[in-house]
Every structure is written in structure tokens, then in C-alpha cells.
Amino acid sequence: DSLFMSIGKIKALDEITLTTNGSQLQSKAQMLKDAGVERINISLDSLDPSTFKKMTRIGDLNKVLDGIHTAIDVGFKKIKINTVLMKQINEKELYDLVDYAIKYYLDISFIEEMPLGNTAYDRQSTSVSNDDILLQLKEKYLLSKTDISTSGPAEYFRIKNTKTKVGLISPHSHN
């Protein structure tokens, strides 16, 4: 807690953004806001408790969802969901995750599975490209490309008639 309070007092910082798995967010959200955190990125790969547990190995979906709702109530400037879609694991949840983001006025970014760790693991068997995600999104939502630019391999789209932006972070297929 004191680390965040100390960082929040640094006047040279334009903004403080935190990326988290969300498991402790319900109890820490107000302290983080008070410390000056303005934006939060929360990992959420599934809305199904068993799939969530499988993907995170120990994660409790309800704790993360409660944390997200507490963060909304606390009033952070921006809350974004980060999601990795994987074939035959959670790829069928694409629309559910986007609809969740729309319902709660959140942004959502899809991050391609990155080739890290065990090099013997065949990521091609589970990896869902952001090109495929974009095609699927266009089947259901009206998207317009934004002029948001980052230093990384990301594209951002606004979903028409919503407050939600979708990010496609493609470190694998577009790098």
C-alpha cells in the first residue's frame, strides 16, 4: 500500500496505470484510487468459472468480477479488460467478453498468445490470431478504427453506439 502512495506523490508522472489479475482488486481498489491510480488493466480470459480456473490454474472468477465491479464503483478514469483467446479453450467466449465490456462501459483488448516459456509447446494449436478476431467482431459489431497510436503492435476500434473500444495487440502476427 505504501508503495502506491509513494508513487502517487511523484509529481513528474502524468498518469499511473496498473495492470493486475484482479484477484485482490475488491479490497485494494479504493486505496489504489486514493494513491493516484487512474487507469486499471485487468486480465479476464473467461466468464466461465471452470474455464477461468483452467486458464489461470488457481484463479477465482468471482473474486475478479467482484474486483472489476468495485473498480467501477470507485470511479477509475478508465478500466480495460485484457484477454487472450485460445482455440478449443475460450475462443467461443469472444462475444460474451465483448458484451460484458459493453454492458459495464469497459474497454477490452485481445492479446495474442505469445511464444514464451516452453518452446516445445505448439502454440499454433491454440493461438487465435487477431486477424481472425477482427473478422469475427465485424460479423456482430459495427467497428470504426480509431486514431489511437501506441509504440507497440496494437490497433484500436470503437464499437458503434457504445462507449467501448476494442484493442487488438498482435505481438506475434504483426511484429
Regions flagged by a language model, labelled:
Residues 1-111:
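Radical SAM/AdoMet-radical enzyme domain recognition
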Residues 17, 115, 175:
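Functionally engaged cysteine thiol sites
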Residues 47, 88, 113, 162, ...:
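Generic structural motif
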Residues 64, 83, 116-118, 151:
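Electropositive, surface-exposed helix/loop patches at the edges of structured domains
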Residues 98-128, 132:
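Aromatic-anchored, glycine/proline-accented short structural segments
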Residues 118-175:
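Accessory C-terminal segments flanking Radical SAM cores
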